[in-house]
């Protein structure tokens, strides 16, 4: 099927084919991206000519790489959120939202010296009923 009659993909017939970057070009692009995520027009012109690429190819590569970096950062943040969530049974929720691992840590540590929850102490003695047993559990 020719590009002009293709109904699945609607694009210009004079579209340039996908550029297969060489390994050395990719390494240089990644190195430059680590240094600076946004290039000025002059930097892009100089950099693209040094790699034998067009300015548009470099511009699009940087756009795609920024999108990838954002996606990876959001995935990492989601992992941290999942790791920071307490393992609670389903249907059980906290009375306050925890939006970040740092917030969760600060909630627990900020109240530590002053508002520690006090658990009831079971009675101890000769006639004390063991914890978990009541008069209804005796047979």
UniProtKB/Swiss-Prot annotation:
InterPro entries (alphabetical): HD, HD_metazoa, Homeobox_CS, Homeodomain-like_sf, HTH_motif, Msh_Homeobox_Regulators
Keyword annotations of the record: Developmental protein, DNA-binding, Homeobox, Nucleus, Osteogenesis, Repressor, Transcription, Transcription regulation
SS bonds (residue pairs): none
Gene3D superfamilies: Homeodomain-like
GO cellular component: nucleus; transcription regulator complex
Pfam families: Homeodomain
One example GO MF annotation: DNA-binding transcription factor activity, RNA polymerase II-specific
GO biological process terms held by the UniProt record: activation of meiosis; anterior/posterior pattern specification; BMP signaling pathway; bone morphogenesis; bone trabecula formation; branching involved in mammary gland duct morphogenesis; cartilage development; cell surface receptor signaling pathway involved in heart development
Basic residues composition-biased segments: 8-18
Residues spanning the signal sequence: none
Start and end residues of each stretch annotated as Disordered: 1-20
DNA-binding region (UniProt annotation): 14-73
Subcellular locations according to the entry: Nucleus
Main location: nucleus
Sequence similarity: Belongs to the Msh homeobox family.
Protein purpose: Acts as a transcriptional regulator in bone development. Represses the ALPL promoter activity and antagonizes the stimulatory effect of DLX5 on ALPL expression during osteoblast differentiation. Probable morphogenetic role. May play a role in limb-pattern formation. In osteoblasts, suppresses transcription driven by the osteocalcin FGF response element (OCFRE). Binds to the homeodomain-response element of the ALPL promoter.
PANTHER family associated with the record: HOMEOBOX PROTEIN MSX, HOMEOBOX PROTEIN MSX-2
Description of how the protein assembles with itself and partners: Interacts with MINT, with XRCC6 (Ku70) and XRCC5 (Ku80).
Protein name: Homeobox protein MSX-2
């Amino acid at each position: 099927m020719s590009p002009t009659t293709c109904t699945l993909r609607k694009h210009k017939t004079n579209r340039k084919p996908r550029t297969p970057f060489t390994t050395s070009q990719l390494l240089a692009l990644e190195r430059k991206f680590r240094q600076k995520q946004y290039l000025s027009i002059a930097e892009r012109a100089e950099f693209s000519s040094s790699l034998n690429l067009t300015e548009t190819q470099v511009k699009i590569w940087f756009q795609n790489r920024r999108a990838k970096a954002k996606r990876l950062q959001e995935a990492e943040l989601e992992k941290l959120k999942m790791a920071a969530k307490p393992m609670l049974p389903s249907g059980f929720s906290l009375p306050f939202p925890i939006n970040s691992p740092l917030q969760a840590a600060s909630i627990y540590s900020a109240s530590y010296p002053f508002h520690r929850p006090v658990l009831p102490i079971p009675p101890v003695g000769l006639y004390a009923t063991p914890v978990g047993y009541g008069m209804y559990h005796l047979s």
